């Protein structure tokens, strides 16, 4: 069996490689996907990904496995970065990591390697199960690290080629394995944030592409102007961090795109923003469209929290979702991801909040 392993230089993908080798497989080649964009590099002034490449080389040398660097900068910009910029311009909250997996890691990469490999291994926290000749995407044992949310838009064809060796482990167990076998990156911290940014701060990326535009920050309850911001695209509804005003904490309650106004409040559960019903479109199912939607739960962001809900399919590409509890951070552009027990069934893009 020929196996391709995607290595990022992090602990997770390195332990995934070790576990596949430990199972007795030897016909293995590793790949590092180069997806950062030249403009961002020149803007920051250095190459924050060189450390990744150094670790990839060290890991492959340790296990005597060949590796190759594949450049997907152009594809990534066209298929993921441009989408992110457009969503921010429209005042939405993008989820670029969903499309990074669908269009690049398991899209452009699969096209590049064609049918050279029987299996592609990564360090994602998720599980694949075969049932009645169908491949199911399941949540990982570690519900905090579970990444099924970001894998929700993969196809049957993509999932059929994948294996996630970390799906049955807790993050603490992965760290312990790394220490036990003395991996070169055993003490390396986990990466945070969007996959293509590396050490570039998210706000620096936004500023580079969309610039700055001064606008008022208004307290929702009083209507008073209490500050100035640099552009609505730097803020997400429900956001708490990054609001640099005294007498906090403050929460972003609403955005007026036309007037470039950010409304904030001390009250996290401000009724205007606590919603439970919304419309989604661009619906994607990993397998066939379900015949009924009973006992479904959804996530509206990455994390442990799931909501019980009622789903009403209006057309094949339009659905109304009613949560059993209100949520103060629902925002157009986010993705609602469908679950039944621990199976991830797919997802859809939120585009209109109803009530």
UniProtKB/Swiss-Prot annotation:
Q: Mind telling me which InterPro entries this protein's record contains?
A: MnmA-like, MnmA-like_C, MnmA-like_central, MnmA-like_central_sf, Rossmann-like_a/b/a_fold, tRNA_2-thiouridylase_MnmA
Q: Where is this site: Interaction with tRNA?
A: 124, 334
Where it mainly occurs, coarsely classed, is cytoplasm
According to its UniProt record, this protein's enzyme class is: transferase
Q: What catalytic activity does the UniProt entry give for this protein? A: S-sulfanyl-L-cysteinyl-[protein] + uridine(34) in tRNA + AH2 + ATP = 2-thiouridine(34) in tRNA + L-cysteinyl-[protein] + A + AMP + diphosphate + H(+)
Q: Where is the signal peptide?
A: none
Which stretches does the entry tag as region Interaction with tRNA?
A: 145-147
Q: Which Pfam families match?
A: tRNA_Me_trans, tRNA_Me_trans_C, tRNA_Me_trans_M
Q: Which family does it belong to?
A: Belongs to the MnmA/TRMU family.
Tell me the protein's name.
tRNA-specific 2-thiouridylase MnmA
Source organism of this protein record: Borreliella burgdorferi (strain ZS7)
